[in-house]
Amino acid sequence: MSATTPGLVCAHHHLYSALARGMPPPPEVATDFQGILEQIWWRLDTALDLEMIRWSAKLGALEALEQGTTAIVDHHESPGAIEGSLDAIADACAEVGVRVVCAYGVTDRHGAD
């Protein structure tokens, strides 16, 4: 006998985090959450361009699908590549066959604009 289950839903993902693997270690060891943000995640998200966003979304979606996840809510930030970033994520996920809802993180850490 076999059973089929519906696809899983990941309600909080950062698809660009697929690019964190292989990053050089931070210059200092983070000892708290703020330090982790500053030393790892904010270094990564400020370096993103549209091509990196597209490929990281595709990789993240493929890895999710491989584990049975068919729908993702992606929380994205790329202060250097805002225009078109959510479309790049949506297109990459569609190519893989994963449903996605994209949300752009709003912050003032790069200034009021």
For the regions a protein language model found, what residue spans apply to each?
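Active-site gating loops and adjacent loop-to-helix segments of metal-dependent hydrolytic enzymes
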Residues: 19-53, 109-113
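Active-site loop-helix segments enriched in His/Asp/Glu that coordinate
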Residues: 47-113
